[in-house]
């Protein structure tokens, strides 16, 4: 069992027919908690109805809320989600929202100091206030895990580079690593070459790239590990990458075999993509059975 802090946006995904609470940091937190970790969230929500519902939901999941801040004026985060015929999601992220105003507090500093790992993403750095808080916490964090989350127009390549330089572990999807390498004027086509280039430029020992239904590549202390993906009927992809990363990090923090780690992570990502919503209940037994049935 590890102490893990997740930093960034808490928001509501608004689908055409319903709303679900989410945001990558909260999705990480929920999955990490389900894997028997102690998890804290550093974020900010509004005093509105969605904020109140969010607090009840987060507390019910057993996540520590001592660093969950309440904003007097800004509303709780909201994202309009559209799904195409293949279940692939596109997002309209509203701005400004409460999570753009995360303050540096004693509670957030203490939670970060006490944590075995600190998970953060690039989307939270879209506003100067939350970006400043993130940069300050990264100065004192251990095992810094960076989820690259490029949502135009809310990213700046220079900020992404800063956040990569701070990271001990970086996770991209295949489109994101292509975009970052293009911005860094690295034009080799091999995914392995791109991963090694990022590792050299940032002095990061561990990088993972997800490839949708084609699995993922893990670069872990100079070795590559591969999973080619699992067949699944996609319902929606919201949260699949978040559960993937949470499961992968959980395995690696506990010194499990890297190949087993990426196999488990790809399996849970597939199961989530084949389910409705970002945080379906999934047990370790469910993952093991899924892998065995597809081996």
Label each PLM-derived region with a short phrase:
Residues 12, 47, 150-152, 176, ...:
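Short, glycine/acidic-enriched loop or turn micro-motifs at the edges of active sites
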């Amino acid at each position: 069992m590890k102490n893990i802090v997740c930093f960034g946006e808490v928001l509501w995904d608004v689908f055409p027919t319903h709303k679900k609470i989410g945001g990558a940091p909260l999705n990480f937190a929920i999955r990490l908690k389900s894997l028997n970790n102690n998890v804290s969230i550093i974020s900010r929500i509004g005093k509105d109805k969605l904020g109140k519902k969010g607090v009840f939901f987060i507390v019910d999941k057993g996540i520590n809320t001592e660093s969950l801040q309440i904003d007097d004026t800004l509303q709780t985060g909201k994202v309009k989600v559209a799904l195409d015929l293949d279940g692939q999601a596109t997002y309209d992220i509203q701005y400004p929202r409460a999570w753009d105003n995360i303050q540096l507090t004693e509670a957030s500093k203490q939670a970060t100091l006490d944590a075995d790992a600190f998970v953060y993403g690039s989307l939270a750095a879209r506003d100067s206030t939350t970006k400043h808080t993130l940069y300050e916490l990264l100065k004192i964090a251990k095992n810094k895990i960076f989820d690259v989350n490029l949502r135009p127009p809310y990213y700046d390549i220079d900020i992404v580079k800063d956040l990569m330089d701070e990271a001990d572990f970086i996770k991209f999807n295949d489109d994101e690593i292509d975009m970052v390498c293009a911005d860094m004027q690295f034009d080799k086509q091999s995914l392995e070459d791109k991963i090694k280039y990022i590792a050299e430029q940032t002095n990061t020992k561990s990088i993972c790239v997800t490839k949708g239904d084609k699995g993922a590549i893990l670069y872990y202390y100079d070795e590559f590990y591969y999973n080619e993906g699992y067949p699944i009927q996609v319902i929606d992809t919201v949260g699949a990458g978040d559960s993937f990363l949470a499961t992968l990090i959980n395995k690696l923090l506990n010194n499990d075999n890297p190949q087993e780690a990426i196999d488990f992570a790809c399996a849970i990502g597939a199961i989530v993509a084949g389910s409705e919503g970002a945080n379906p209940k999934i047990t370790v037994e469910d993952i093991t059975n899924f892998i065995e049935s597809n081996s």
